[in-house]
Amino acid sequence: MHRIEIANTRHQRVEVWKSTMQVEFRVQQAVHAWWHAQRFLTGLAWDNLIAASLLHPSRAPGSILMLGLAGGTTFHGLRHLLPNTRLTAVDIDGEIVELARKHMHLNNLNCEVHIADAYEWVRNSKQQFDVVIDDVYLAGTNDVFRPGNWDAAAMGQLQQLLAPGGILLTNLVRGVGHRALQIRIRDLFRDSFSSVREVRTPAGLNETLCGGEQVLPAAALRQWREKFHSSRDRNLWDKITVRTLPKRQPK
């Protein structure tokens, strides 16, 4: 791959790297978004979000909202699997969205994109969705971070966006510097939903929490395997794990 562009947006410095078949957006030397002409999975956090969206009790949700679109990697995979689903996204960085239109074929995904602060948009929205994905991270000096407050009030605002039977997904970075937030959000999910599952890939440093009245088990993912034409994608799909989080013990 070779670097073809550098964009200094209001929120981050984005390097665009490209080869014949794929494109990467890199922020602080980490891959921030990825697109491939023939493949959809990476073994990283985007796979978790794609898989977790399919744990909706309907098995094929009719509408998905994503908070934090970036280059559209998750929507690239979801559109492949769900050609008729209504896809809506909110991202604060309009410049990276334009880069995605230019380099990652975002316009081909037939998704509605709002340029706004995601949590402010949530507070003002009256819409409801089968799946709500919270993937809001911003680039800090040395690492990514979550803006805003993650508390019961914030959880309640996200829950109001869920249609009956809907599920909420949250992408969490694991590891040093992120553990306290991970514990807090896990506890909020277990307090807020009757069913909570954790979705991971073995090579990734992230987990996706998935909460709702009903969240399907790992077996629900099997039906989607053959939708991937690449053997690499199928192998990565097979490695995704889904684990039930138990209810919190009373103090």
Where are these regions (language model features)?
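S-adenosyl-L-methionine
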Residues: 23-27
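Conserved S-adenosyl-L-methionine
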Residues: 193-204
